[in-house]
């Protein structure tokens, strides 16, 4: 019993957590805990945990797990229903009730006294009832149903006693007492729970306890005798027999008064409004009787009557003792805890009721149809609960990742209203500590829903504190190297923002668009304060004006990132750095001037200052050498013109004379004959007598050509021909045959004109 109550308490706690939590990991954890618990059909019917789990069927992460768990519990409920005694047909139950009433009327008509009724079975004797009241209900064994194996026709037909039976001999049917359907029938809401149960389920006789003299404090009458009791009240008391005791008359009249005083409620009244009134009526009925306290055996059917109401509808299940499902049994008095334990023992010890729903279920198909009808049942919450439900739903939607439309919200509310009524009501009744914890967890979930990025204004606040003293001590920095928060925050993914991130420890969550894949562009390690300061001074060399007596090894990480011109500008303020930075200039020399060789007796600083002017010096030397080389070279061929002072002749006369001079040349000897003298010329060459007639033709041509010819080109060719003739004369060489042939062809060509 303790294990069952522990399981029930654990299921209720997990149910509340499933209704309040939204994180997938926690939901999966709670579902795993529920699957590990030893679940029974009674716990499922009492808590409604299956419908709470079914609401998670369409969840993105735990939907499959919740669907499998709900299906497994459904099989558990179906197997439990099949193992229980099958439900009876309503028509069959009504016929059995009519048969019992007719049998009692026949016994009264025969004149059977109260103490001379047929012998009862041991289970229906008063001694057995007193023993059963002292024995815990869990140790009692349910009585076998002897009539369930009889055919339907035999159960409907009454058995007639034999004719030779005596006056006080019971009929064969009375030897095996008729049992009414176990469990409560769907009684009217206004009736008392005690009248809704038959005594066959409690191990009692068909007649009320008051008729048999039992000291019961409640006048319990069978629900099947509702119509017959009204007829008995209208009859005179003497017509019912003279053997009835005054106690019987008093008990019946009391029961009739209770039925008349109880107002009839409509059949659609909620269980919340009906069950507290039933509980009060039970107390009043107990006080109207012998004044004894109502035992747990008489209150147990009430709890069994509530289970089908909970499994059929999604209304909140009110407990008789006011127990909060979220708090378990905490905060109850010892008497209430004892009464609650007695109720649970009675529920587990008694055989389960047959009618779990308001409509009888006869097959597995009907069970599935009822289950499908439950899923699409219209919500019937009160106005106050609808207001509370909407507020909780709005809070949950604020923490969600995406907002849905109003139409989607209405559909989701209509589908989830039946499963969330109990969970939200139980969550509303949590203690204040748990409410504060749930609010903190919801706030944490809302924070975790978004991307976990550090806002940029946090870093801007850090640099706002340092802006004043930085401006007081350092020179104004450039816009690209500024570290103040005046710049507008840009997107983290922009490359400009990454370049302008002056603070080295600033985390950049942007991703580089690289072909090899997206990688986070952030530093692997957080830099130290010294590294951050060195980075700032390296990016802002103008801010470091005077270092004073700071050792070089402190400034070395800063100076390594400076350019040579920046080092040169810092020389005027820090003369001590000139000797120390010689090694840095050496590195710059090797980087910028790879082919230069250092000169002796010169520092690397002087070397670097000289090397930028070396290319210009080499260019000037090269230009001077080229110019001197061109001046010393001899001149090449020169074209000179000979100008003759002569009168221009007509082109016709010039062409004629050229032809004549060409014809006078001797092709064999290569000599040119002198031209004919003009008539009347008295001028005689001076050298004509000294040299041979043909031999002196060249000199005569040179003398007379300026006067006779106007073509300067021809005269120049003749001048060159004269020394050639002398050379040939001295050499006495013979003209080549091809040359002679060419000359002859040339002569013939011009002679044809």
Curated annotation (Swiss-Prot):
Ranges where the record places region Activation domain: 500-659
Biased composition (Basic and acidic residues): 147-157, 271-285, 333-348, 409-428, 654-663
Annotated stretches, region: BC-box: 528-537
One cellular component term from this protein's GO annotations in UniProt: nucleoplasm
Annotated stretches, region: Interacting with Elongin BC complex: 528-537
Start-end of Acidic residues biased regions: 366-377
Comment block on domains: The BC-box, which mediates binding to the elongin BC complex, has the consensus sequence [APST]-L-x(3)-C-x(3)-[AILV].
The protein's assembly and partners: Heterotrimer of an A (ELOA, ELOA2 or ELOA3P), ELOB and ELOC subunit.
Name the UniProt record assigns to this protein: Elongin-A2
Source species of the chain: Homo sapiens (Human)
Organism taxonomic ancestry: Eukaryota, Metazoa, Chordata, Craniata, Vertebrata
Gene of this entry: ELOA2
């Amino acid at each position: 019993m303790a294990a069952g109550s522990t399981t029930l308490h654990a299921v209720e706690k997990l149910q509340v957590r499933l209704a309040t939590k939204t994180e997938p990991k926690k939901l999966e954890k709670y579902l795993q805990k529920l699957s590990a618990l030893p679940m029974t059909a009674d716990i499922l019917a009492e808590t409604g945990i299956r419908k709470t789990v079914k609401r998670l069927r369409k969840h993105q992460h735990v939907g499959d797990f919740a669907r499998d768990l709900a299906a497994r519990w459904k099989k558990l409920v179906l197997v439990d229903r099949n193992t229980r005694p099958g439900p009876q047909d309503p028509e069959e139950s009504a016929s059995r009730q009519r048969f019992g009433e007719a049998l009692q009327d026949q016994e009264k008509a025969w004149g059977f006294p109260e103490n001379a009724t047929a012998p009862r079975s041991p289970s229906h004797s008063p001694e057995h009832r007193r023993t059963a009241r002292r024995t815990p209900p869990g140790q009692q064994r349910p009585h076998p149903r002897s009539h369930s194996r009889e055919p339907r026709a035999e159960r409907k037909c009454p058995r007639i006693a034999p004719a030779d039976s005596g006056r006080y001999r019971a009929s064969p049917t009375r030897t095996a007492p008729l049992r009414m359907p176990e469990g409560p029938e769907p009684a009217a809401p206004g009736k008392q729970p005690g009248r809704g149960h038959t005594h066959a389920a409690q191990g009692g006789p068909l007649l009320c306890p008051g008729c048999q003299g039992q000291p019961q404090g409640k006048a319990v009458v069978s629900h099947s005798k509702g119509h017959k009791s009204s007829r008995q009240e209208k009859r005179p008391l003497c017509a019912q027999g003279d053997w009835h005791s005054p106690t019987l008359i008093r008990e019946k009249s009391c029961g009739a008064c209770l039925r008349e005083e109880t107002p009839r409620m409509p059949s659609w009244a909620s269980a919340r409004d009906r069950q507290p009134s039933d509980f009060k009526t039970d107390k009043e009925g107990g006080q109207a009787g012998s004044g004894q306290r109502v035992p747990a055996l008489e209150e147990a059917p009430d709890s069994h009557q509530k289970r089908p109401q909970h499994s059929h509808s999604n209304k909140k299940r009110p407990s008789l003792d006011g127990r909060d499902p979220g708090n378990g049994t905490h905060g109850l008095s010892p008497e209430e805890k004892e009464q609650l334990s007695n109720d649970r023992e009675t529920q587990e010890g008694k055989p389960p009721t047959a009618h779990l729903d308001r409509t009888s279920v006869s097959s597995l198909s009907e069970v599935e149809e009822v289950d499908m009808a439950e899923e699409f049942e219209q919500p019937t919450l009160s106005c106050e609960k609808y207001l509370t439900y909407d507020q909780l739903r709005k809070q949950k939607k604020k923490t969600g990742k995406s907002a849905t439309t109003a139409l989607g919200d209405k559909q989701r509310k209509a589908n989830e209203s039946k499963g969330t009524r109990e969970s939200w009501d139980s969550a509303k009744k949590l203690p204040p500590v748990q409410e504060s914890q749930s609010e903190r967890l919801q706030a944490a979930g809302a924070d975790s829903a978004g991307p976990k990025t550090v806002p940029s204004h946090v870093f801007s606040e850090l640099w706002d504190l340092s802006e004043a003293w930085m401006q007081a001590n350092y020179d104004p920095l450039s816009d690209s190297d500024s570290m103040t928060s005046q710049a507008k925050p840009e997107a983290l993914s922009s490359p400009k923002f990454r370049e302008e991130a002056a603070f080295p420890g600033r985390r950049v969550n942007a991703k580089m668009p690289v072909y090899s894949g997206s990688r986070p562009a952030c530093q692997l390690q957080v830099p130290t304060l010294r590294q951050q300061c060195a980075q700032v001074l390296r990016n802002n060399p103008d801010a470091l004006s005077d270092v004073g007596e700071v050792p070089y090894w402190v400034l070395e990480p800063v100076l390594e990132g400076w350019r040579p011109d920046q080092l040169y500008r810092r020389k005027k303020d820090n003369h001590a750095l000139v000797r120390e930075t010689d090694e840095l200039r050496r590195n710059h020399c090797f980087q910028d001037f790879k082919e230069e060789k250092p000169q002796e007796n010169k520092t690397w600083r002087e070397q670097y200052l000289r090397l930028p002017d070396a290319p210009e010096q080499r260019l000037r030397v090269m230009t001077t050498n080229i110019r001197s080389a061109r001046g010393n070279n001899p001149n090449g061929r020169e074209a000179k013109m000979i100008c003759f002072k002569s009168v221009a002749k007509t082109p016709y006369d010039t062409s004629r004379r050229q032809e004549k001079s060409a014809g006078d040349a001797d092709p064999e000897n290569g000599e040119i004959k002198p031209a004919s003298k003009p008539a009347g010329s008295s001028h005689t060459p001076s050298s004509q007598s000294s040299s041979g007639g043909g031999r002196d033709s060249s000199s005569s041509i040179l003398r007379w050509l300026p006067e006779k010819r106007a073509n300067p080109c021809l005269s120049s060719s003749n001048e060159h021909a004269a020394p050639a003739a002398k050379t040939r004369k001295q050499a006495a060489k013979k003209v080549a045959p091809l040359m002679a042939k060419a000359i002859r062809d040339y002569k013939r060509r011009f002679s044809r004109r």
